[in-house]
């Protein structure tokens, strides 16, 4: 059984506090984009969970979130059968686009159908939260306000068909490390989430592009100054606004039209030769 597992960007990311377990309390606007991995799962003749992937640098053992999802799903519903999971990877790894989380989300949804468990999306999201804070959102997808550590999800009016160029530099970033180095007391200006939501409801891409904000840039851009150059190059190439997604290092920019986006894409691809560059669009939701 096959399914597309879509990437996400953060249109806003704010940290407003910290829990006793050191997880940050967040307010984020998440958005699905039309860049996806393909997850294919079939039952196996034994009780093993095996993972294969078209990219050699993706771990295929218990470190992979898709593997963790399969283990948790089997434990939760007392399933003995094994599964073979194939991941066709297109979403960049360690990029701040929820590549691992969206794979885990797809595994839960597929196994729910494959084994005729018929668990509700809410139950799947509860299992997903044990894997990672982005997994519940990845199960739901679309345009959403995510709060708590990311598990409190309020769907928003779809902000679809917005053109963006996405650039993932040729290095990864540790999400854990970024959050460890984030000092909430040093955040001078918090994100105007309500203003952004209002603008998105009014389909005001210009306001959104100029006012989107990610407080994790304070950490990641300090360590990787090339990201500032990428943002500046995107703006010079005609972007309405550019920002880092999640903990980074991926940077994305919104564009008014496809021609400008195409030119920016060509320029960025030429300048940042060892980076992954994509043109994509925001989409309404997953096809879960």
UniProtKB/Swiss-Prot annotation:
EC number, UniProt record: 2.7.1.148
Tagged with keyword rRNA processing: no
Alphabetized Pfam families for the sequence: GHMP_kinases_C, GHMP_kinases_N
Gene3D superfamilies linked: 3.30.230.10, GHMP kinase, C-terminal domain
Pathway(s) the chain acts in: Isoprenoid biosynthesis; isopentenyl diphosphate biosynthesis via DXP pathway; isopentenyl diphosphate from 1-deoxy-D-xylulose 5-phosphate: step 3/6
Enzyme class of the recorded protein, top EC level: transferase
Catalytic reaction equation(s): 4-CDP-2-C-methyl-D-erythritol + ATP = 4-CDP-2-C-methyl-D-erythritol 2-phosphate + ADP + H(+)
Superkingdom assignment: Bacteria
GO molecular function, one term: 4-(cytidine 5'-diphospho)-2-C-methyl-D-erythritol kinase activity
A single BP term in Gene Ontology: isopentenyl diphosphate biosynthetic process, methylerythritol 4-phosphate pathway
Active site (catalytic residues): 8, 134
Record family assignment: Belongs to the GHMP kinase family. IspE subfamily.
Protein function: Catalyzes the phosphorylation of the position 2 hydroxy group of 4-diphosphocytidyl-2C-methyl-D-erythritol.
Name used for this protein in its record: 4-diphosphocytidyl-2-C-methyl-D-erythritol kinase
The organism's taxonomic lineage, starting at the top: Bacteria, Bacillati, Bacillota, Clostridia, Eubacteriales
């Amino acid at each position: 059984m096959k399914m597309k597992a879509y990437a996400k960007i953060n249109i806003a990311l704010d940290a407003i506090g910290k829990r006793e377990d050191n997880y940050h309390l967040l307010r984020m606007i998440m958005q699905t984009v039309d860049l996806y991995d393909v997850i294919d799962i079939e039952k196996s003749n034994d009780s093993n969970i095996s993972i294969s992937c078209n990219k050699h640098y993706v771990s295929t053992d218990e470190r992979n979130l898709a593997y963790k999802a399969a283990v948790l799903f089997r434990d939760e519903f007392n399933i003995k059968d094994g599964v073979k999971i194939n991941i066709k990877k297109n979403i960049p790894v360690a990029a701040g686009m929820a590549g691992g989380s969206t794979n885990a989300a797809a595994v839960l949804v597929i196994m729910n159908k494959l084994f005729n468990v018929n668990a509700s999306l809410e139950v799947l999201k509860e299992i997903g939260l044990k894997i990672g804070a982005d997994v519940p959102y990845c199960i739901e997808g679309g345009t959403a306000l995510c709060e708590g550590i990311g598990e409190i999800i309020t769907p928003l009016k779809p902000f679809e068909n917005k053109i963006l160029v996405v650039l993932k530099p040729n290095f990864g970033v540790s999400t854990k490390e970024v959050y460890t180095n984030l000092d909430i007391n040093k955040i001078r200006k918090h994100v105007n989430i309500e203003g952004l939501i209002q603008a998105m409801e009014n389909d005001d891409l210009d306001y959104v592009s100029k006012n989107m904000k990610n407080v994790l840039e304070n950490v990641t851009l300090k360590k990787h100054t090339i990201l500032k150059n990428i943002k500046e190059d995107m703006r010079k190439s005609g972007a309405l606004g550019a920002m880092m997604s999640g903990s980074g290092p991926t940077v994305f920019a919104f564009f008014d039209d496809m021609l400008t986006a195409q030119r920016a894409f060509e320029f960025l691809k030429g300048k940042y030769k060892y980076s992954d560059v994509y043109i994509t669009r925001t989409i309404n939701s997953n096809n879960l």
